[in-house]
Amino acid sequence: MARLLQASCLLSLLLAGFVSQSRGQEKSKMDCHGGISGTIYEYGALTIDGEEYIPFKQYAGKYVLFVNVASYUGLTGQYIELNALQEELAPFGLVILGFPCNQFGKQEPGENSEILPTLKYVRPGGGFVPNFQLFEKGDVNGEKEQKFYTFLKNSCPPTSELLGTSDRLFWEPMKVHDIRWNFEKFLVGPDGIPIMRWHHRTTVSNVKMDILSYMRRQAALGVKRK
């Protein structure tokens, strides 16, 4: 119980610095549906070097943040913030997973072998190296979308009613639950069930605040059960 109380106090302190930033951001986040059938642990993906298939059940008991990423996007700077998020919340059980995709404005044009060098020397550049796992480039929407993204999208309402400019979106057929752009995010809980979905323009600091708020609520529930 002492550990749960300590975790709750730490989360409260972290949240205190982000309350003011959360106002007006509610529409940038959607809670996922209740009564979801199945879990993310039924799926997995190949690492960016193609050398290892990682079943997502490896992350059982962790909070997992799924992010579709791109190297030549106006939001590519989020990589730096995601590194900071991973480092800060890893002690609380957060794991970030990145999935390169070229379906939005053709902003991830390179081969898998080119993505890490691009991040290091071009964008964000400056020797940047992600501290979270990246997987092989693939589709998140359309006929060839990765199956775990089908599961995530069907589990959570879309973050916007509009898909965007059709000449910058490269998949068919287009569906209401589709991901709108690079750097949209899904949070999956320790039980493998999706919890939240964020619009791509939601700041990482607000994503962080939402995650901490949820963790704090869960920690409080754990204390009450004791």
UniProtKB/Swiss-Prot annotation:
GO molecular function, one term: identical protein binding
Leader sequence residues: 1-20
Catalytic reaction annotation: 2 glutathione + H2O2 = glutathione disulfide + 2 H2O; tert-butyl hydroperoxide + 2 glutathione = tert-butanol + glutathione disulfide + H2O
Superkingdom of the organism of origin: Eukaryota
Tissue expr: Secreted in plasma.
Keywords, comma-separated and alphabetical: Oxidoreductase, Peroxidase, Secreted, Selenocysteine, Signal
Catalytic residues (positions): U73
Subunit structure: Homotetramer.
Similarity field: Belongs to the glutathione peroxidase family.
Protein name: Glutathione peroxidase 3
Species this chain originates from: Homo sapiens
